[in-house]
C-alpha cells in the first residue's frame, strides 16, 4: 500500500494543475464568452469505451478489445495494466464499463463489465485489484447475464452508500426489460461484494429500476440525483433521472409518453418520462456532469457523447436538477464520440469510437480529446469548495455542528441527502450566523451528504 499512496501523492501534485506541455490546438469553439480549445491527449487507441478520472489524478481507460490502462493527463502516456484474456469481442460487445472504488488508497479495487463466452455469449461484473502497477486477482461478482453482440448496457456507478449501480441492456430480448426476474433491461444495485442490498426495492432482487432498452451513460450530479442516458430504437434517445423501483417504459414506450398506446401504458404503470430526448436518435453513449468555473457556460449541465450524432451535447439543468433546458451541440469534427470524464481542473476528456466498425477511422483514431479553457486561472475562490464547510462530530449520532468559514451574509439553506440522493432534512443559517447545530433525530444510521453554498461534506450517522 506504500507504493500506491506514493503514486497517488505524486499524481496529486501533477494532475490538477496546468498540463506539463500544451498540445497543439485542433480546433476551438465558443461556449458563451469562453473559448474552448480542443487538442489530442493521446492517439492510436482501439475503441476506448470508458474513461474514469481516478483518485490518483490519472485517467483510467478500458478499450473494447480487453485492455485496461492508466493515461497520464499531462503527457498522454498510456500505461497498460492488464489485457483480460477471456473478453469476447463481437460487434458492440467486449470490455465495456469500469469504475474505481472511492476509497482507492485503502481498497484498490477496479470494477469492470465485459462480455465472455461460456456455453453462449454472456456478460459479467468482475472486481480486479491494483498492486505494483498491474491489475489482477479477478473476482466475479455477477455473471451469467444473458447477452448478444449488442445492447449490453454496462455503465457502472458507485453511490455514497457504497453500493454499485450497473446498467444492463435488453440483449435484444425486448420483454425482459419489464420482467423483474430477468437481469436484462435494468439498472441493477449491488453491494461492492456482489451481494444484494437489503434495502433494494424488491427483497432479494438486484433490480433497482427497470424498463430500459440500452442505458450507456450513468452519473450522479452534485445535486444528488442520478442521471442515465439511454439508446432509443428509432424515434428518441433519452436522459432519465433514475429512481428506485421506477419503470422507464421499454419496450412499450420509447422516449416521451406521447403516443396513444404509450400514454395508456404510462398511466397504468406510472412510467417515468425522460427529462431530455433526441429525435431522431443520435446514439447517445457516455454521460458526465459539469459544474466547474473553468467553462462557466457549462456549469450545472450534463455533457453527453453521441455516436451516430458525432457530437457532444450540453444539457443545462435547472437549480433543482429536475428540468433540462435546450441542448447545445459542439465537437462535430471528430466522428463518433463514446467515453467522457471531467478532471478536477475543469478539463473535459472525450474518447472517440471510430474503430468500432461503424465509421471510417482517421490516422489518429482512436484518440482522447481534451476540451479546456486555456485562459482559465484557478484561484482560491474557484477551487473546490468542499473544504470550506466543517462538520463535527463525524461520525455523529444525535447532533452535528456545521461551521462556515465566514458568517453568512444572507440566510443560507442546508440540505441533508441520504445515500440515494433523497433530501431528508433541511435547515437554515441566519444572516450573520457561522455555526449551526442540527438534530439527527429520526435519521437512520448510514452515509449522508450535507450541502450548503460553502460546499458539500460527507456525514456518517451511527
Language model region names:
Residues 21-174, 225-232, 280-319, 347-357, ...:
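Acidic, Gly/Ser/Thr-rich repeat motifs that build Ca2+-stabilized beta-propeller blades
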Residues 1-22:
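Bacterial Sec-dependent N-terminal signal peptides
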Residues 23-28, 93-95, 103-105, 171-327, ...:
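Beta-propeller domain segments
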Residues 382-392, 396-462:
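C-terminal outer-membrane/trafficking sorting elements
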Residues 70-71, 189, 416:
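Hydrophobic beta-strand positions
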Residues 77-80, 324, 422-427:
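Surface-exposed loop/edge segments in extracytoplasmic proteins
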Residues 45-48, 85-89, 144-149, 203-204, ...:
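Short coil/turn segments at the loop-to-beta-strand junctions that recur within blades
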Amino acid at each position: 500500500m506504500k507504493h500506491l499512496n506514493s503514486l497517488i501523492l505524486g499524481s496529486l501534485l501533477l494532475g490538477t494543475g496546468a498540463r506539463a506541455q500544451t498540445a497543439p490546438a485542433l480546433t476551438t469553439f465558443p461556449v458563451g464568452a469562453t473559448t474552448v480549445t480542443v487538442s489530442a491527449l493521446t492517439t492510436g487507441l482501439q475503441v476506448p469505451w470508458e474513461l474514469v478520472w481516478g483518485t490518483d489524478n490519472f485517467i483510467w481507460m478500458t478499450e473494447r478489445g480487453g485492455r485496461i490502462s492508466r493515461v497520464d493527463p499531462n503527457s498522454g502516456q498510456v500505461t497498460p495494466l492488464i489485457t483480460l484474456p477471456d473478453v469476447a469481442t463481437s460487434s458492440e460487445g467486449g470490455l465495456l464499463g469500469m469504475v474505481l472504488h472511492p476509497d482507492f488508497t485503502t481498497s484498490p479495487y477496479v470494477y469492470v463489465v465485459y462480455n465472455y463466452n461460456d456455453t453462449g455469449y454472456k456478460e459479467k461484473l468482475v472486481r480486479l485489484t491494483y498492486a505494483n502497477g498491474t491489475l489482477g486477482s479477478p473476482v466475479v461478482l455477477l455473471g451469467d447475464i444473458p447477452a448478444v453482440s449488442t445492447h449490453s448496457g454496462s455503465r457502472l456507478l458507485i453511490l455514497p452508500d457504497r453500493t454499485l449501480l450497473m446498467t444492463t441492456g435488453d440483449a435484444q430480448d425486448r420483454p425482459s426489460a419489464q420482467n423483474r426476474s430477468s437481469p436484462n433491461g435494468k439498472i441493477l444495485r449491488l453491494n461492492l461484494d456482489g451481494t444484494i442490498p437489503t434495502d433494494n426495492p424488491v427483497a432479494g432482487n438486484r433490480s433497482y429500476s427497470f424498463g430500459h432498452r440500452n442505458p450507456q451513460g450513468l452519473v450522479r450530479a452534485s445535486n444528488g440525483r442520478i442521471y442515465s442516458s439511454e439508446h432509443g430504437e428509432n424515434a428518441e434517445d433519452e436522459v432519465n433521472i433514475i429512481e428506485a423501483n421506477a419503470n422507464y417504459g421499454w419496450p412499450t414506450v420509447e422516449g416521451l409518453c406521447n403516443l396513444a398506446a404509450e400514454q395508456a401504458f404510462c398511466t397504468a404503470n406510472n412510467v417515468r418520462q425522460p427529462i431530455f430526448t433526441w429525435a431522431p436518435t443520435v446514439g447517445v453513449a457516455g454521460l458526465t456532469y459539469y459544474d466547474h468555473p473553468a467553462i462557466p457556460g457549462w456549469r450545472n449541465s450534463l455533457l453527453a457523447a453521441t455516436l451516430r450524432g458525432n457530437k457532444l451535447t450540453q444539457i443545462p439543468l435547472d437549480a433543482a436538477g429536475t428540468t433540462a433546458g435546450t441542448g447545445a451541440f459542439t465537437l462535430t469534427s471528430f466522428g463518433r464520440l463514446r467515453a467522457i470524464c471531467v478532471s478536477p481542473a475543469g478539463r473535459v476528456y472525450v474518447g472517440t469510437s471510430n474503430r468500432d466498425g461503424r465509421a471510417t477511422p482517421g490516422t489518429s483514431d482512436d484518440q482522447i480529446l481534451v476540451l479546456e479553457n486555456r485562459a482559465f486561472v484557478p484561484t482560491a475562490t474557484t477551487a473546490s469548495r468542499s473544504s470550506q464547510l466543517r462538520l463535527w462530530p463525524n461520525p455523529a449520532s444525535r447532533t452535528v455542528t456545521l461551521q462556515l468559514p465566514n458568517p453568512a451574509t444572507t440566510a443560507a439553506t442546508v440540505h441533508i441527502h441520504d445515500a440515494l440522493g433523497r433530501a431528508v432534512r433541511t435547515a437554515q443559517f441566519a444572516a450573520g450566523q457561522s455555526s449551526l447545530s442540527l438534530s439527527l433525530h429520526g435519521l437512520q444510521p448510514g452515509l449522508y451528504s450535507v450541502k450548503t453554498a460553502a460546499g458539500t461534506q460527507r456525514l456518517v450517522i451511527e
